[in-house]
Amino acid sequence: MQGLVKPSFSMTFKCRSGFVTTMHIAMVSGEYPPRWGGIGSVVYHLAGHLASRGHDVTVITRTHKQATPQQPGVSVLHVPWVKAPMMFTRSYGKHAFVELRRLHQVKPVDVVHTLLPLVSWTRKEYRWVEEHVAPVVSALNGSWIGEREGMKRAARHKEAATWKNPNDLAILLTGGYYARYEQAGIEGSTACVAISASTKAEFEHWYRPPEDWWCETVLYGVDHKVFRPMNHDHEEEQLAYEELRKSYGAADEAALTGDASTETPLLLAVGRLVARKGHRTLLRAMPSVLKQHPGARLVIVGRGHMGRTLMRQAKRLGIAHAVHIQPGMSFDQLALHFRAADVVVYPSYYEGQGLIPLEALASGTPVVTVNQPPLTEMIDEDVGELFTCGDHEDLARAVNRCLDQPEERTQQMVRGRQRVLDHYTYEHNAEAYEAIYESMLS
């Protein structure tokens, strides 16, 4: 498993403001709740866990109409931004740079933690921050070039047209241009942290890291308290579970008691309704799944432009009766879906890491996903099944293998949960980043 072992040296270290026992960490992130995207959720939990370890954390993020959730020890500063695809990263980056300078004058910063690629700084800006504020650690959350190449792969496998989504179209057309800001980040930061070995390899292949590049690999964790296995002995939880299963028509007697031998298995796919998430490939696999498991039902949860496209495809394939698309839901409902599902399917064509599979494992649900990095850094046959990316027939075979082996699936549920607890929690992440910060400053 990937990760960084915390050094054994003392928590007391020398920084520019003298000897201290806590750090003031400025996190520069284009996403933060109520933007609960992958990066937003990670920064929220990482900031909270760093604060719980005694550090002061200030998050500089984009303005939002809704209120920001509060956490002890975490301050949030909002800056304006231009509401345009890709351009917002530079607009936000400029305002965040100014706000960071102001913050440092009021409350000296010990470490600057940027979340790429959603903040675009120039080489000059990185140099100024390193010289006048604090050392920078840049988290590499995938790359624009990687996103672009993932879209091209999805197009080759007849996923939806990229031009239907303005954000995807902007990445396709301008990803190469905005990659210059990622290049500035890997050149101008004291340290970088890739969110997977695959992402680190992307930067080594498509970008130009300096010869003395310091880049660690730390895979993000998930909230193992929110995403947890089903408790069938808890009356209210069991009633909610039964209601959910019945609403999708996946509620035979075995299913309602959590028996893995159910003949009405519930498949769950979570992810934005965009081409590179592979939902159309999943739909093409469903006729073969239903032929072998006619009682199976598929629920797709995600926002995006493709909802109608997917339902039209389901009707053409004759599987509309077995497919449900949910445009979005609360965290509590999403967590219940993860617990209630028999299998989570994740057919994505590109991820910097991909948190959905870990949320599934934490919930005690096996995962069927693509046999390529970074997914294979987290998922193997001990906790699920793998299939060839873009091959809907192989996807169907993988799902059927999982459903055909209820006893093995029960063991996968246990092993998956334990894997998360052992390696992929926000507690692990806070410890790893704290060690990196200390190494930068010692």
Q: What do the PLM-derived regions correspond to, one by one?
A:
Residues 311-329:
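Nucleotide-activated donor-binding/catalytic signature segment of Leloir-type glycosyltransferases, i.e.
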